[in-house]
């Protein structure tokens, strides 16, 4: 919405995708540049084997899941079901999950309710400070479908299960 409001008053508009050009209302001064990807994402992708070894993954599949820095209730609920299933069925995975700021207590309650716990196969944190490294190591990512997350997933070529947010402007996920 902010971009749409400011577009008429700026010299140049940068758009992430071609579909945004007309919506921004200033096609004559809009350039499609795609979404930026942090250089660290590309750099760490080259260190995949070393990062996996550091994590102690061995031959296990690494699943990385997160719902954003604040946390997404539905992502935490779905991931809790998956973690319970993984542990019940002794699946050979290393699951790394970030609950987000408002998901810590919820996830702890879900652990008790569903009968699973962090340990050798499950690492739960509030926030991920080393996302480029974990994206490099992961085999599968479960997350919201934010534009920058999608750009980073594409940059490192990771398979993903994307959970759209119901709370975005103009249904952009």
Place the predicted regions along the sequence by residue.
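Active-site-proximal region of nucleotide-activated glycan assembly enzymes
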Residues: 1-46
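Short acidic active-site motifs
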Residues: 1-2, 129-133, 149
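Short, charged/polar "capping" segments at the starts of alpha-helices
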Residues: 20-23, 41-42, 102-108, 170
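Donor-nucleotide binding loops and adjacent catalytic segments primarily
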Residues: 47, 53, 57-140
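Short hydrophobic beta-strand element within catalytic cores of glycosyltransferases
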Residues: 143, 159-170
């Amino acid at each position: 919405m902010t971009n749409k409001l400011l577009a008429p008053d700026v010299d140049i508009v940068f758009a992430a995708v071609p579909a945004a050009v007309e919506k921004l209302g200033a096609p004559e001064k809009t350039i499609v540049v795609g979404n930026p990807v942090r250089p660290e994402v590309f750099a760490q992708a080259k260190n995949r084997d070393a990062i996996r070894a550091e994590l102690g993954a061995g031959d296990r599949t690494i699943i990385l899941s997160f719902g954003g820095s604040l946390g997404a209730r539905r992502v935490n609920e779905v991931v809790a079901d998956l973690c319970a299933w993984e542990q019940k069925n002794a699946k050979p995975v290393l699951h790394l999950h970030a609950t987000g700021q408002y998901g810590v207590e919820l996830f702890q309650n879900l652990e008790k309710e569903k009968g699973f716990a962090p340990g050798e196969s499950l690492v739960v944190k509030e926030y991920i400070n080393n996302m480029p490294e974990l994206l490099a190591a992961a085999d599968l990512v479960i997350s919201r479908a934010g534009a920058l997350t999608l750009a980073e997933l594409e940059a490192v070529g990771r398979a993903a299960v994307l959970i759209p947010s119901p709370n975005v402007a103009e249904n952009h996920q």
